[in-house]
Amino acid sequence: MKLKNKKIIVFGGTSGIGLETIKLLLQNGAAKVYAISRNPKKVKIRKKQLVLEKADVLDENSLKALFKRIGKYDVLVSTATGGERAIGPFLSMDMQGYKNSFDKLWGYANVVRYGVKNLSKSGNIVLVSGSPARKPKPGFVAISSAGGAVEAFARAITHELAPIRINLISPGVIDTPMSPLKGKARKDFYKNSTKDNIIKRAGTANEVAKAIIFAIENEFITGTTIDIDGGWILS
């Protein structure tokens, strides 16, 4: 699928991976890109092809109204996690925090369920999971569980959605604004998090966004996961 003249929706499109995806979509000639988040005013890009919309992926009524306003479109991308990400040992983890990690699944389920009605039959969907979904490491039990559920969900509905394609992008450790750490603490965190990887650095949001563009454009892939992880899976 060529991006030129296409109408594309990006959930979580106001920072990090989502924002970088929007930049690439605009650079590649998309006719209209909708950046959806709970705080769309964070986006500083001002282009006539870019439309900022406010919505919460966990609010079903909000999503129904959003898709009704937008109407027919060609591509659905969601990088929005929809909730918190509990980290740490499972046996000492706050169980509500663990349960809330699955908001990622409910958010994706909602955008697919309510978004597919107006999606072109030649269109496609790209969701973002994460390397811990298939290569768990200590302290990542909540992220691994939720990510695994997301990947199972996407594959389970691949046949039902066809001819619409659906694929997953699985990032490893990525340096994005989601991390609250600053300065040396931030540098040390990413160094320690990637020391066992084959590529010993954090990835960038742009590197993940390029994979999303690939998944959109390549018409011979569906129901699969593309790893952008610096070798996390093999570490």
Where do the PLM segments sit?
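N-terminal Rossmann NAD(P)H-binding glycine-rich loop of SDR-like oxidoreductase domains
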Residues: T14, T21-K23
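Conserved glycine-rich Rossmann-like NAD(P)H-binding loop of the short-chain dehydrogenase/reductase
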Residues: L26, A30-V43
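Rossmann-fold cofactor-recognition segment
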Residues: K47-N61
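Conserved NAD(P)H cofactor-binding loop of Rossmann-fold oxidoreductase domains
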Residues: V77-I87, G230-G231
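Catalytic loop of short-chain dehydrogenase/reductase
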Residues: P89-K104, Y108-N110, K117, K121-A162, ...
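Conserved Rossmann-fold SDR core element
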Residues: E151, E160-D175, I221-I228
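A glycine/serine/threonine-rich, flexible loop-to-helix segment
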Residues: V173-D196, S235
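C-terminal substrate-recognition "lid" of short-chain dehydrogenase/reductases
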Residues: R201-I228, I233
